[in-house]
């Protein structure tokens, strides 16, 4: 299995590029009226699972370095995410032209990422989520080095337990109403994050796991079955299962297999790999720009047809993300001596 995991590591940025484009498609406010594209768009929240899986995978590599420094780890993650985040939410705040006390309070909640944890609904929830995951990963890594897979079992089990508690609380106490804001979006990604870390361990530490024909068949069958379940969930039970968190379960099985298949694909088609790698390198900028540009665009512009709206918002997002990426890479990385990477 080690060769395919090395391929996964090699094409990690390209897979992130695929994930961010999928997420951008998911967030489009206007349907395309093409059934297969609209279904692919409707399940685009799986792009987040890909990001989280690859984050766990990559963090294991980072912390396994001989010269690892915890202070530098937190500093690099801080400067990679928060300054750009603050710039974007600052522009969004000014563009909305609302300077009330409530608006300032919401801005502070966003900027500190704390609003997410007290039930504030916000499009930038993923920043709070990933900052939290980055913060706790060194604790997991230390426990994993001491206790091995037992630590992984407890952390993954904690994620499933939070999902189950949330689901039961929603169903039994709140008539399946979303009472916790977007908090479930993090709970639902805890298992796949630590599964990603296990894959990182297998790749980095050279675990001798043979990728036999039987293992391939089991993995593909499990992923295909999960995809069918996802289709059923999405077609017949979308709102009921989305609220109580159960709609996120299929991606825990689908994501690792999908990432491995994408790695094989990008390894074969080099030109496509280079294109998607560019999007992957700008994945943070694309995420930050598109969520606010989509919102502002559709709040203020309603005279374009749906196709023009979709194309224009994505093009503006690409342009804004590229500018933000260049500024961060040229200015911030030079001043902080931190190499900007996904």
Model-based region annotation:
Residues 1-18, 148-151, 215-218:
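N-terminal membrane topogenic signal
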Residues 16, 42-52, 61-118, 133, ...:
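Transmembrane alpha-helical segments and their boundary/interface "anchor" motifs
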Residues 21-29, 111-115, 156-171, 222-236, ...:
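Aromatic-anchored segments of alpha-helical transmembrane domains
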Residues 94, 122, 193, 221-333:
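Alpha-helical transmembrane segments of multi-pass integral membrane proteins
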Residues 134-161, 200-222, 302:
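Solvent-exposed interhelical
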Residues 330-342:
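Membrane-proximal cytoplasmic C-terminal regulatory module of class A 7TM GPCRs
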